[in-house]
């Protein structure tokens, strides 16, 4: 790399709440809500397949090494996810149009799959580099830095190959890489909570939200699996139920309220009911859904200290208990 870089928490530098006009916040929240509705409608069954913990951890550590904001790491994960889904779809499409020769078809499939595997690290780094270019507060990661990093891992690439990789990602996504991330929803909702008189300071919630959002990205599957089981009150969901649940995984507004509610419980559980009540009135998301999501996050993040776990209460009943508490105090 271009000399040693000391990791820092760029997301918290010069970050302030309460300095944006209420009209601007309202417009931003409305825009995010519209984007979220569209994303939920268009949710594909393949989304989420490339959010494996090892991949997410790689992106997070690389972003930290390059001193990038947390928003960049989330953006990079979303870009990589959508790009790899497109690549996988293209491979399947090419495999189906090949002549019906079983032996040749198998060879073509293996070749296409291997090509995808061989370029994966390059694609991942390209997604991080592209994400860094979307933030005004980050320095753009130079090609030399990227090439040196890849070389340290044993991958030898030229500047031309690096530029081609970025262009491949851009073309595959129709140059639409400024994708919304859960952090944008979290921070916008925190702004609204601040104006609504939330008892827990937004900055305190923000720091905890970043930690929990990392947790959700790293433990994406187990958290959403537990949420699915709680929502259907069944420990063994069917494949069809799992496929229908895909839209929930793409609901960033729901994720944001769950993150904030869980953060509020950690910061000051006595104010939890007030925070959840505000979130319900702002987003229209049911108290039960907020309670279930916050419980799923807390049980994976805090474990035994979570309400319900201490008394060995089933998850869906514990979530109902949280919902009841919120209803009675708002």
From Swiss-Prot:
One of its GO terms (biological process) is spermatogenesis. Keywords: Chromosome, Cytoplasm, Meiosis, Nucleus. Coiled coil: none annotated. It is found in: Nucleus; Cytoplasm; Chromosome. GO terms for cellular component: chromosome; cytoplasm; nucleus; site of double-strand break. It comes from the Eukaryota. Its main location: nucleus. SUPFAM superfamilies: Cyclin-like. Residues 27-178 form the Cyclin N-terminal domain. Plays a role in the different steps of crossover formation during meiotic recombination. Participates in the crossover differentiation step of crossover-specific recombination intermediates through its interaction with PRR19. In addition, stimulates crossover formation through the interactions with RFC3 and RFC4 and simultaneously regulates cell-cycle progression through interactions with CDC34 and subsequent ubiquitination of WEE1. May also participates in an active deselection process that destabilizes or removes excess pre-CO intermediates. Interacts with PRR19; this interaction promotes crossover formation. Interacts with RFC3 and RFC4; these interactions facilitate crossover formation. Interacts with CDC34; this interaction regulates the cell-cycle progression. This is Cyclin N-terminal domain-containing protein 1. It comes from Homo sapiens. The gene is CNTD1.
């Amino acid at each position: 790399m271009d000399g040693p870089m000391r990791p820092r928490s760029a997301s918290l530098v010069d970050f302030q709440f309460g300095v944006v006009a209420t009209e601007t916040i309202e417009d931003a929240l409305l825009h995010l809500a519209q984007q979220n509705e569209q994303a939920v409608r268009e949710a594909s069954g393949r989304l989420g397949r490339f959010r494996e913990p090892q991949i997410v951890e790689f992106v997070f550590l690389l972003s930290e090494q390059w001193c990038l904001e947390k928003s960049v790491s989330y953006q990079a994960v979303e870009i990589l996810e959508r790009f790899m889904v497109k690549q996988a779809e293209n491979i399947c499409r090419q495999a189906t149009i090949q002549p019906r020769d079983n032996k040749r078809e198998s060879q073509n499939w293996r070749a296409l799959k291997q090509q995808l595997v061989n370029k994966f690290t390059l694609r991942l780094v390209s997604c991080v580099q592209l994400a860094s270019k979307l933030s005004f507060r980050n320095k753009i990661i130079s090609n030399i830095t990227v090439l040196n990093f890849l070389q340290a891992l044993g991958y030898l690439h030229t500047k031309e190959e690096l530029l081609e990789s970025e262009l491949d990602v851009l073309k595959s996504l129709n140059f639409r890489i400024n994708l919304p991330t859960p952090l944008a929803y979290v921070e916008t909702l925190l702004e609204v909570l601040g104006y609504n008189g939330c008892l827990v300071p937004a900055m305190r919630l923000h720091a905890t939200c970043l930690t929990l959002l990392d947790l959700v990205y790293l433990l994406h599957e187990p958290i959403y699996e537990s949420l699915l089981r709680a929502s259907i009150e069944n420990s063994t969901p069917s494949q069809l139920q799992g496929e229908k649940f895909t839209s929930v995984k793409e609901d960033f507004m729901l994720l944001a309220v769950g993150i904030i509610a869980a953060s509020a419980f950690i910061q000051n559980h006595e104010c939890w009911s007030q925070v959840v009540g505000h979130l319900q009135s702002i987003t229209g998301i049911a108290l039960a859904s907020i309670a279930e999501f916050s419980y799923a996050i807390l049980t994976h993040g805090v474990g035994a200290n979570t309400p319900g776990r201490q008394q060995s209460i089933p998850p869906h009943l514990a979530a109902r208990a949280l919902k009841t508490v919120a209803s009675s105090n708002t």
